[in-house]
Amino acid sequence: MNDILNKEPMEEDYGIEKSLRPQFFNQYIGQDKVKEQLEIFIKAAKMREEVLDHVLLFGPPGLGKTTMAFVIANELGVNIKQTAGPAIEKPGDLVAILNELEPGDVLFIDEIHRMPMQVEEVLYSAMEDFYIDIMLGSGDGSRSVHLDLPPFTLVGATTRAGMLSNPLRARFGISSHMEYYQERDLEEIVKRTADIFEVEVIDNAALEIALRSRGTPRIANRLLKRVRDFAQIMGDGRVDKAITDKALSILDVDAAGLDYIDQKILRTMIEMYHGGPVGIGTLAVNIAEDRETVEDMYEPYLIQKGFLMRTKQGRKVTQRAYEHLGYVYNEED
């Protein structure tokens, strides 16, 4: 995939995303349904002087799950401790993290689906009853130690909700699905980021960047950064529609936000298989990508944009994809 359209965080994103991160719900653009629900749950918990139920945030990468976790902590007025599933390798690692929590704190675990099962099992009692029992030592000298924990809120984030075990999923009182962003929300995000970057962006340029951002704020901000570079070197520093079109064309991002591989998938299906249906494994072999990459990185956006659909027989290209790529659509195909 064209790196600029990769939804996973790149090294250059980390510092920028932190500086752009909204602090409270009234600064957070988009995800209105999720925000509305969480605002109610948080206000109710604060009125009862209770900790907020554990929250699961799930959805594609780049949609603001980490940002939402920090907003939740800020709205609660508590501290947040951040870690990631792969970093918690053994139960002792989890115990050390839990032991640092203060009453009411938020523990944010990104990629929670990647925690080892032995760690996950220790987390069950911590989430449900705020205690853990751990074994110290080994063999005849081993002993069980009971450790009470302060009440806390676990916020888990995952791009693979289906990989969570049923016992873990059941312990989240709140589950929030983060969806792809609408263009109008992405346009507002581009404008907000431009203000922070102190770069002038003309309205139609902000919309153009939004339209090509694959419904993902991370990509919108990354595109704005690159277009800003073109505007600085090839223009007068302002990001207008003309410089935006030129920059994104050079970056191989078309009007629908498709890159070379997206187009290759659709063209291969049209030219070799008359638009499908095609099995995902066969398709992956034909474009020299592994199946998981096609399923995780390309297919969701193509389906969301109406260029691809799943059937029992396999994947099929839609009439919209034919027209977008300049092919003549034959309904018999």
From Swiss-Prot:
Q: Where is this region: Head domain (RuvB-H)?
A: 255-333
Binding sites annotated in the UniProt record for DNA: R291, R310, R315
Q: Name one GO molecular function term.
A: ATP hydrolysis activity
Which SUPFAM superfamilies does the UniProt entry name for this protein? P-loop containing nucleoside triphosphate hydrolases, Winged helix' DNA-binding domain
Q: Which reaction does it catalyse?
A: ATP + H2O = ADP + phosphate + H(+)
| Gene3D superfamilies reported in the protein's UniProt record | 1.10.8.60, P-loop containing nucleotide triphosphate hydrolases (3.40.50.300), Winged helix-like DNA-binding domain superfamily/Winged helix DNA-binding domain (1.10.10.10)
| Entry keyword set | ATP-binding, Cytoplasm, DNA damage, DNA recombination, DNA repair, DNA-binding, Hydrolase, Nucleotide-binding
For region Large ATPase domain (RuvB-L), the annotated ranges are 1-181
Instruction: Kindly list the places in or outside the cell where this protein is found, as annotated in its UniProt entry.
Output: Cytoplasm
Coiled-coil annotated spans: none
Region (Small ATPAse domain (RuvB-S)), start-end ranges: 182-252
Gene Ontology biological-process entries:
DNA recombination; DNA repair
The record's listing under HAMAP family reads: DNA_HJ_migration_RuvB
Q: What does this protein do?
A: The RuvA-RuvB-RuvC complex processes Holliday junction (HJ) DNA during genetic recombination and DNA repair, while the RuvA-RuvB complex plays an important role in the rescue of blocked DNA replication forks via replication fork reversal (RFR). RuvA specifically binds to HJ cruciform DNA, conferring on it an open structure. The RuvB hexamer acts as an ATP-dependent pump, pulling dsDNA into and through the RuvAB complex. RuvB forms 2 homohexamers on either side of HJ DNA bound by 1 or 2 RuvA tetramers; 4 subunits per hexamer contact DNA at a time.
Name of the protein in question: Holliday junction branch migration complex subunit RuvB
- Which source organism? Lactococcus lactis subsp. lactis (strain IL1403) (Streptococcus lactis)
